[in-house]
């Protein structure tokens, strides 16, 4: 890997998705390399992010920078959420009753029993309100296709996995605690977080966001849902997690590029 870096040169910064895999660690710890890690995913277990081995860690927000707790951390924002916040949803429902296409985003449910448990209250709502139910699996999850087929074998649902959330046609969402909540919030589409744990990343939001800790609570929140009631909560959520979609990554990378050229010029470039 050191030979690879030497061939590529040092006049350009190395932008990494992580500095905790073998090859990325080798690059990040090279004394001549200027590198930056782009935050990828929520800062839950900090062992996946700390210590910061790269020159810099580009965090999504002030909150993420605080969680990383390193002098190398920069509040940089992210392209993804900045882009999503500029999109306008085709649907804008005020209540759950108005929803025509409801998306369930799975993250922690993996076995057929877990998936069936998660779907049960939604199927009850579907029977009562007549909406179309869509299910999206986390693209990086270890879902078994057989387990999923078993869970939905008798249900009228649409299945998604690799598709980007913004390409799916839906107007309401139920989300098992994951980064997907940010995607949906950026799109301006109402959602309810489903979180039956007590120590998840989203625990701090249980008094703010509509959060279902049980099937019974999910049913109640859905029936009583009002977008006007929760819109301030969604906006506060975006402010805390991604600084309302502000993105400085471009300018920061240009700055790193200038630093590299000033420091190394052509000395290490082929």
Report each predicted region and the residues it spans.
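Active-site and donor-binding regions of nucleotide-sugar-utilizing enzymes
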Residues: 1-81
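Structural motif
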Residues: 13-22, 39-40, 56, 59-62, 101, 105-110, 171-174, ...
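Short, aromatic/basic amphipathic alpha-helical patches
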Residues: 27-31, 68-70, 122, 144-155, ...
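Catalytic binding pocket for nucleotide-activated donors in carbohydrate/polymer assembly enzymes
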Residues: 69-71, 75, 152-153, 179-243
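Conserved catalytic-core segment of nucleotide-activated headgroup transferases in glycan assembly
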Residues: 75-150
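Leloir-type glycosyltransferase catalytic cores
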Residues: 108-117, 208-270
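Donor nucleotide-activated moiety binding/catalytic core segment of transferases
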Residues: 139-187, 191
